Swiss-Prot record:
Organelle targeting peptide span: 1-43
Name this protein carries in UniProt: Altered inheritance of mitochondria protein 9, mitochondrial
Sorted UniProt keywords: Mitochondrion, Transit peptide
Similarity annotation: Belongs to the AIM9 family.
Gene that specifies this protein: AIM9
Transmembrane segments: none
Effects seen without this gene: Increases frequency of mitochondrial genome loss.
SUPFAM superfamilies attached to this UniProt entry: Protein kinase-like (PK-like)
Other facts: Present with 8200 molecules/cell in log phase SD medium.
Compartmental location: Mitochondrion
Cross-referenced InterPro entries: Kinase-like_dom_sf, Mito_inheritance_9
Organism field: Saccharomyces cerevisiae (strain ATCC 204508 / S288c) (Baker's yeast)
């Protein structure tokens, strides 16, 4: 049974090489329960025939369906690649491994840019990581297994005739190659930094390509396969206090918090994202901060290995492929000097405003087919320009009212998906490995949002009996609601308690006033839909109500709230926000933008709960009103 997997999948595909030379066995597995699969069906295809249509099913997206534009969304996630090209790359890294065996022990070499437009991390391509190959022997892919279809990547397990497995990550082509190039280059360098400098256990990366011109014919990352279980298996956010699984609950909090502690342990010298220094040879030197990424490095192999360059935080790149990269995006991506932490917020606002303006211009010119109301885009412009305007005043960076303010403002590494779903515990040593550094960046801890698995913005309940009057007299339905609030509060409190244990100088970042001050920026970072600009407005209006108090305590720079809202502005906002909440409540699967896990989708379709329309979209059949 494959262990490097994610709960909730509905299908798994396998391609295997048969004993017949040059043949590939395609295996498609339909799963009806999590982690449980039926006996697979087998289809054979020639190894060298990259254009065999029998393979297409292996590359198609199968883990979910969309109510709207299902065909188009799945086509965007089609990840066809060259198996023969992958085979060549595997043979190349084993040749490099033999060469690395001659290097002095402990020597850390820089990445090697190969002639086939891939990059090898030769310090990882060593026999202890990938095994040895006999002279004149060739590496052969024996089995390919599709083990995860995530939000951003397709994950394949690659087995070889050397009894050595690898992981191949193929990003979905949801954005242009320039975006994917920056993202992959930074993620690989960041994982290298986390491994070699911070001592964080991550899968070793062996080779990667940033575009489709390499032998794989797709951007890719080839990395170590870790056999084990996801830490999420032990996470139950609604566990009862004193449960028999309490130790598992506590261990999850500890493991994730320990990773965070290592991520933020080193103060860096700029804000942005991490890249390899030798990316400079083909790039623009102005993209990178000239000084060292951090101070005090004594290992000559690590000196000048990494640089800080443009931020690859997802919010800065999402849905911006239509912008002119050099003129409209690059000026807002950093890197930013450590003396200007609030420029991150300012540039986030300016970039999103520029994006909305461009989309309006494209619609007016008739060059955009997107279905978006101009009023929504105009409101976004106002919202993001307000965010940019208030950015310099959100925090008084010289305040004494917030303890250890300079520690909170220092550049530190931020992992946007710090979550039990991204931590795998290996089978043999029971050691935790942190996965998926996509979108990682360096920014002040005071601007880093809490991990999503413990984040909670609702009413806080710390003790059901003390905080809720006559709790025992409530109905069972009311008790369940309050118990849910209590458990979410408890989870967040346990996380913050662990933060205080590990990093006491950073604990004031979770103080309620600090959370409120950064809330407009966090709402911008976490925005998922067009209408959620309203959540940024809501945070700004909440700040308006308490600004005078914050100013009196020297938490902010200006005595007067920097933004102007008329009575009509506020009334319109309240009305629009109410409509958004009603839409989220009344629209099925609104929280997932209409995406439904495939096993659930099939059940709903077969039962008649969802109905296919003539245009290919699906509607959810509303239950008939009871008489």
């Amino acid at each position: 049974m494959i262990r490097y997997t994610v709960a909730g999948h509905s299908r798994r595909c396998v391609v295997g090489a048969s004993k017949r030379v040059g043949a590939i066995k395609c295996i498609t597995v339909a799963a009806t329960k999590r982690f449980i699969s039926n006996k697979p069906n087998e289809v054979f295809t020639k190894l060298t025939n990259d254009n065999d249509p029998k393979r297409d099913a292996f590359f198609k997206y199968t883990w979910g369906s969309w109510l709207k534009n299902d065909k188009q969304e799945k086509e965007k996630r089609f990840t066809k690649f060259s198996i023969e090209g992958l085979n060549r790359i595997l043979n190349d890294i084993y040749i490099q491994s033999n060469e690395m065996a001659k290097a002095p022990d402990g020597k850390i070499l820089p990445p090697v840019f190969n002639k086939n437009l891939t990059v090898s991390l030769v310090n990882n391509v060593v026999p202890k990581n990938i095994g040895k190959i006999n002279p004149n022997e060739k590496v052969q892919v024996t089995t390919l297994s599709s083990i995860h279809e995530g939000k951003h990547h397709r994950i394949y397990k690659v087995d070889t005739n050397l009894n050595k497995a690898f992981i191949l990550r193929i990003p979905y082509p949801l954005e242009n190659e320039n975006t994917l190039s920056y993202r992959i280059r930074s993620e690989v360098a960041t994982m290298d930094f986390a491994d070699l400098k911070l001592g964080i256990k991550v899968p070793k990366i062996f080779c990667y390509g940033v575009n489709s011109l390499n032998p794989v014919r797709q951007p890719f990352v080839l990395q170590e396969f870790i056999e084990g279980e996801l830490l999420m298996k032990d996470w139950d956010p609604l566990i009862e206090d004193g449960s028999s699984n309490q130790k598992k609950y506590d261990n999850v909090i500890k493991q994730v918090s320990d990773f965070q502690s290592k991520l933020v342990s080193l103060k860096l010298n700029a804000f942005g994202s991490i890249y390899f220094n030798n990316d400079l040879k083909d790039g623009n030197e102005k993209e990178f901060v000239k000084e060292d990424i951090y101070d005090g490095e004594t290992n000559p192999d690590l000196q000048n290995r990494w640089k800080i360059g443009p931020s690859v935080e997802r919010c800065l790149w999402r849905h911006k492929s239509h912008l002119d990269f050099h003129k409209q995006m690059k000026p807002f991506l950093g890197p930013w000097p450590k003396k200007s932490p609030m420029d991150i917020i300012k540039n986030t606002g300016l970039l999103e405003a520029e994006n909305a303006k461009t989309r309006i211009a494209m619609k007016e010119a008739g060059s955009s087919a997107e279905l978006m109301y101009p009023r929504t885009l105009k409101e976004q412009i106002t919202t993001y320009e307000n965010l940019a305007k208030i950015a310099p005043d959100l925090f008084n960076v010289k305040t004494k009212a917030i303890p250890n303010m300079q520690e909170l403002l220092s550049p530190r590494l931020f992992h946007p998906d710090l979550d039990p779903m991204n931590i795998i515990v290996n089978k043999e040593a029971q050691e935790a490995y942190l996965l998926d550094f996509e979108g990682a960046c360096t920014k002040p801890f005071i601007l880093q949002n809490s991990p999503q698995f413990i984040a909670y913005d609702g009413p806080k309940i710390y003790d059901l009996k003390e905080d809720i009057t006559d709790f025992d007299k409530l109905s069972e339905a009311e008790k369940v609601q309050y118990q849910f609030m209590y458990k979410r509060t408890r989870n967040q409190h346990q996380w913050e308690k662990k933060l205080n244990d590990n990093n006491p100088k950073l604990i004031t970042a979770v103080a309620p006033p600090v959370k409120l001050l950064r809330s407009p920026y966090i709402a911008a970072v976490e925005r998922k839909t067009e209408e959620e600009y309203l959540l940024i407005d809501e945070s700004l209006l909440q700040l308006k109500e308490v600004w005078d108090i914050f100013a009196q305590n020297e938490l902010v720079n200006q005595k007067k709230f920097p933004l102007n809202y008329s009575k009509e502005d506020i009334e319109r906002h309240v009305e629009d926000l109410q409509k958004l909440h009603e839409k989220l409540i009344s629209t099925p699967f609104a929280a997932t933008q209409g995406w439904i896990p495939q096993d659930m989708f099939d059940q709903l379709l077969n039962s008649g709960s969802i109905v296919k329309q003539e245009n290919g979209d699906y509607t959810v059949k509303q239950p008939e009103a009871t008489k």
